[in-house]
Amino acid sequence: VDLVFTANYVSMEMLEEKVKALDDDYRIFYRRITEDLIADPAQSVDAVMERHIRNELGAVPEEKLCAAMSGMIWIDLFVRSYFREKVVQTLADAGIIVRVFGADWEKIHCKKPQNVRTSGGKVNSAACVQAMRDARIALNVMPWFKDGAHDRVFTAMLQGTAALTDDSRYLREECRDGENICFYSLRALEQLPDQVVSLLEDPVRMAELAERGYRMAEKRHRWKNRAGLLMQALRDIDK
């Protein structure tokens, strides 16, 4: 298997219907936020939400700001689904087979749907890990926080698979592009198919990248590493 993506799909048509069902003022307000995030995907969802809320309501207290933001969590789903769709469409329409493991991918619209090979529905975490292990490249699309990572990235590395993902500040700090990870840009998705082909056509380079990714993740990004950090944080609180 050349390339896998382990994630569910939420159709943009369904999300658009939810937006259309809103009152006019809310629909316009939420549309501005999603358009802002799509226009500049490097922004974090919380920062953009806060900016738009304060522009609309002025100097609101922190409690009201938090309450307003908690009711807008679906915006992350909207933007994430938009880019998941765009990424898979871009690859499939360029002739690259994408094996997707998750719900509802049969609903995606693209010019070459035969290149989107589905698992037939939801799969459990063990099946996702096995899919990564069986693949040469594991694709990721980050959630809309911009100073963290998704476990898909490190799970792929720990299976000895090359990780291909959009970036974040944290991932840039932890990883080296082209050495132990491969970054693509949501602002330049037209370059993504060439990145995939370049990796697949150079199996030695890809294997070396995957091996370096494995060594880095095995040393720094297993769950026991996170448990150690949490235990240290708890000890610091008790001091």
Kindly label every feature range from the protein language model.
Residues 1-146, 168-170:
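Nucleotide-sugar donor-binding catalytic core of glycosyltransferases
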Residues 78, 103-238:
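Catalytic binding pocket for nucleotide-activated donors in carbohydrate/polymer assembly enzymes
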Residues 9-12, 93, 97, 202, ...:
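A structural signal for alpha-helix termini and helix-coil/disorder junctions
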